[in-house]
Each structure stands twice: as structure tokens, then as C-alpha cells.
Design a protein with these regions (language model features):
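Enzymes that bind and transform nitrogen-containing heteroaromatic metabolites
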Residues: 1-218
Length: 218
């Protein structure tokens, strides 16, 4: 759990054997199979909130709801969107009663937001919302657990912040290759191996045709 802010942060990613989350053209559906995707819905059901960056919304248009889980509850849906670029027709705005939070920066574009009773806009005091600020705001709203689902830049931001407690990595039996294909984690500023993030692997299990690595950050 994030020591200062009281929120347990879990980072979940689905990647190929060579660590890619999309091809060079941006195609990403599906890297993993149905069993792994069902596990993702179980994870969402166990967390108070789920978070993605704006690039993931624009590329994949996710719903971020819980489906296929008996008596499941969809978490609060959060988008990091520094410049308020999220399209108004994004599926995340579907009014199903699940709260939506958009975290923007202080230089965000002036715009009209969808008229939804469960929509909340948080404006950061900085151009790009800092992870510690985001977690502090979520804690004020009573949220105690957060599932981070992408993308590459957002994963890196959370890992660099030191707030991530748990990693849940679904590995699909595919190889994309190439330098242009998107790697699952963005720049961490690691120049020497002794600067690399160290993890403790709790378990490696088969999930359908895929593998699930459950680990903690040291």
C-alpha cells in the first residue's frame, strides 16, 4: 500500500513474450485469451478504481467495466488526460451509473464535458498530474485500491513514483518483434542494471493459453 496515501496500487498489463503491448501499427486485440481477460474482470471487481492514460482511451476506447462476474461491481473509472483530449463519444462516458473521473493538468483545453451525474473533473496544480497528487485526491474520495491498466507511459509514471505495490502481468504466447512495436513499459531512466526495478515473483501460473506472473515491487 502506498505508505503516505493509503491506497493499494496494482499494475496490470497484458504483453507478448517479447514484452510488447501492441504492434507498430497500434493493433493490440487480443494479446491474451479469454481466460486471461476474465481474470482481468475479476481484478477490476476487487478494486475500488481502475485507471488508464488518455492514449489508451484514444487507441482502444475501453469500457473499463466488470463483465461476466456474478454480482460484480464496476470500479470507479479514471482517465489521466493532461490536456482534456478525451473524445466525448468515448465508451467510458456510457452512463451506466459507474462514476468517471478525468484528471487534467492546469493547462488543459477549455471544453464542454458530457452532462453525466457521475462525472468528476480533477484539475492538477501542474501541467501533467503527478502520481502522488492523483493518489492523494483519490484517497480524499474514499478510494483504497487502484488498478492501473495502461498504457506504456502511464505504467512508467506509476513505477517511477514508487507507488506500485503489486504487478500482475499476463504473458501471451506471441512474439511481435521490432523496435517500433510498443513495449509495455515506457522510459524509466535506467542506465545501469543496478538501477533497474527489482521485483519478487509471488507466483507464475497458467491461465488458459497464457501465463500470469504475480509479483511485488521490492
Amino acid at each position: 500500500m502506498s505508505k503516505e496515501l493509503g491506497i493499494k496500487v496494482t499494475l496490470k498489463a497484458a504483453l507478448t513474450l517479447d514484452g510488447k503491448i501492441a504492434t507498430a501499427s497500434g493493433h493490440s486485440k487480443w494479446i491474451t485469451g479469454e481466460a486471461a481477460r476474465h481474470k482481468v474482470h475479476e481484478l477490476r471487481n476487487k478494486n475500488d478504481a481502475v485507471l488508464v492514460g488518455i492514449n489508451t482511451v484514444i487507441a482502444d476506447d475501453p469500457e473499463l467495466t466488470v463483465r461476466g462476474i456474478e454480482n460484480g461491481n464496476s470500479p470507479v473509472r479514471i482517465v489521466l488526460d493532461s490536456m482534456a483530449r478525451i473524445p466525448e463519444n468515448s465508451r467510458i462516458f456510457q452512463n451506466d451509473g459507474t462514476p468517471v473521473i478525468i484528471a487534467t493538468g492546469n493547462k488543459a483545453l477549455s471544453r464542454k464535458w458530457p452532462n453525466l451525474p457521475d462525472l468528476k473533473i480533477l484539475t492538477s496544480p501542474t501541467v501533467t498530474p503527478e502520481i502522488t497528487w492523483i493518489l492523494s485526491e483519490l484517497h480524499k474520495l474514499g478510494l483504497k485500491s487502484l488498478l492501473v491498466e495502461g498504457g506504456s507511459f502511464t505504467y512508467a509514471s506509476f513505477l517511477k513514483s514508487g507507488a506500485v505495490e503489486r504487478l500482475v502481468l499476463f504473458i501471451g504466447p506471441k512474439i511481435i518483434g521490432g523496435q517500433e512495436a510498443l513495449s509495455w513499459c515506457g522510459e524509466l531512466g535506467v542506465n545501469q542494471l543496478d538501477q533497474a526495478l527489482q521485483i519478487d515473483i509471488s507466483s507464475i501460473t497458467a491461465v488458459g493459453e497464457d501465463w500470469l506472473i504475480d509479483a511485488k515491487i521490492k
